[in-house]
Amino acid sequence: MSYSYEACFWDPNDNGVNILLGHISQGIRSCDSMILFFKQRSELEKDYARRLGAITGKLDKDIGTNMDYGKLNETFNVVLSVEKARAQSHSKQSEILFRQIYTDTKAFAANLQARYTTLSGKIERLRMDKFNKKKGCEVLQKKLQDAQIRFRDLQLNENNMIGAKRVEHNKRELLKWESNSQEYKVQLDVLKQEYKASQKFWIHEWAQLSCELQEMENARISFLQSKLQQFATSSMETYILEQTKMDMLTNHLNSFTAADEISTFSKENGTGRLKHKTSKGDMNSSANWAQMSSISTTSKKTESYMDNIRKLSSQLKETENKRKLASIDKYEKPLPSPEVTMATQFRNSTPVIRNETKVVANPTLSLRSSPVQLQSNVDDSVLRQKPDKPRPIVGEEQLKPDEDSKNPDEKGLMVHKRNQSLSSPSESSSSNPTDFSHIKKRQSMESMTTSVSSMANSIDDSQRFAKSWNSSNRKRKSMSHLQVPSSASSRSDDGGRTPNSAHNLNEDDYNTRRDTSTSTILFKPPVAVRGTSRGHTHRQSMIMQDSSNPIEDALYEMERIQSSSKPGTKTGNIMDERGVVRDRGITVTLPIVTSEGFPVIEYAKAMYPLIGNEAPGLANFHKGDYLLITEIVNKDWYKGEVYDNDRIDRNHRIGLIPYNFIQLLHQGL
């Protein structure tokens, strides 16, 4: 079904005619608004072009009087040409607006008004003719009824008259009203026929007139669309020209620096140079040479470090395969319980794995400050008999072995060369941060560390650790928890202190902590309970000796450790650190929960105001207000609360916050 003026404005009382004529008249009056807009806009563009031309002329005169030097003077000339082009563009736009848009729209609106006046007058005449004939029919019908009633009364009183004169008068009246009734009846029949004819003519004429009104409205809308499109095109041409000129100016500004200008002027207009002493020149060249050699040494160390990592990875895989295949060994040797740390640091934009061994092997650290007493019941002879235990590999990701295709002889030669390179004091401390060969009697601990590291690196983060470990262990970033014995004497002391430490530590103190910001995993194995003999193992391994799937065993053990940890003391220090942000160098303390009790995950500051928007669920705020972010909806929207602004209604103080209106604040002092 199609809708049009010709088909949708028919009714017995002609109400549709009034509605349609009012709509057409309102549209014509709206044209006057656009005519006034185009006129004022053309005057504005003309005045802007005139003023800009005057400013440009003054700038041209000043540049000619006070000339700058070099590239900056060329930049001034570029600015002058850009502004001249801008003034010409706006002058052209003013002419287009006045001559092509304003004038044409004004003439079209006048023609439209004249056409509407003609059509509306014709419609009114037709409607009036139809109305008059209808009204005449009603009047004649009433007269006919009155004449018929009078004739009937006279006819009834004809036999009741006394006297000849009265009878004669009654007859004359009877004949008169009878003739009047006949005449009214004939006139009424004729007028009814004329009224029916006027109705038919109105229907025919209204169909044509409504079609003409529809064509007139269509022409008005199309004309205004074309003129507005012409206005948009002329404005866009001006804006594109301005953008092009501004890009040219920007490129010219980026083509030189202040140092270039100073150097050029000094070169072309310099009058003499000071002679520098040779020693100072030698010193500068020596400093440059030292810097270049330092960079070369760093790159060589990085390459050496990567080679060491690859070699250790190959040794690790080979040792793991031997352990799995060796089913003869039915017991697990008791190992000390160091805390295994995997950390990553970025130094000078180069990934470097932090050497945790230096902290561990520091002789100034005593066993009294360590949170866990190290225990070992392995004698020195057993430790010396297994020198080729794999060393721990510490890092954010364990590198894949790249030497699987080599034969056993080449691998043995590589291991021998690796042991020789690690035995030198210079390489043990700086070349490979993961090497522990310079620390004596560490084979058992290194074996345990290597097995845990290899398994931990092969398990996905999302399967191993819950997100709650992030908040519970951020406060344990300090390296003061890392402390292991570094000499044979400390090992012998551990053996003597094992019973005491077993009484002081609980069996359930088996905590696993992970800090995602530094990729650190800390394992605290349980201490043997009272009554355990020295010959038994003091540490429960995360993997069973004859396990066919060590990764699943390690995963199960980690989940059990996580579920047994106490969550009550995990968020204390983290909540203390939150609420303190930096705003333009000023420390600001904000609440860590909203007024409704929701925890705050981010803090932000409003860079632009968002006021007066009555959309439901949208927060309103002023520029400079602090915002408490409680939820990140997506990359474009946050959800939160406006902090401490009573000028905003309560219904719009909490809701959605657009990301491009705010700036996130960094936490911490």
Swiss-Prot record:
GO CC annotations, alphabetized: cell cortex; cell division site; cellular bud neck; cellular bud neck contractile ring; cellular bud neck septin ring; cytoplasm; cytoplasmic side of plasma membrane; HICS complex
Coiled coil: 134-200
Alphabetical UniProt keywords: Cell cycle, Cell division, Coiled coil, Cytoplasm, Cytoskeleton, Mitosis, Phosphoprotein, SH3 domain
Localisation per UniProt entry: Cytoplasm, Cytoskeleton; Bud neck
Subunit comment: Interacts with INN1.
Miscellaneous comment as given in the Swiss-Prot or TrEMBL entry: Present with 195 molecules/cell in log phase SD medium.
Function as written in the Swiss-Prot or TrEMBL entry: Throughout most of the cell cycle it forms a double ring that coincides with the septins. After the onset of mitosis, forms a ring-like structure which colocalizes with the medial actin ring. Mediates cytoskeletal rearrangements required for cytokinesis. In conjunction with the medial actin ring exhibits contraction-like action.
Protein name (Swiss-Prot/TrEMBL): Cytokinesis protein 2
UniProt source species: Saccharomyces cerevisiae (strain ATCC 204508 / S288c)
Name of the encoding gene: HOF1
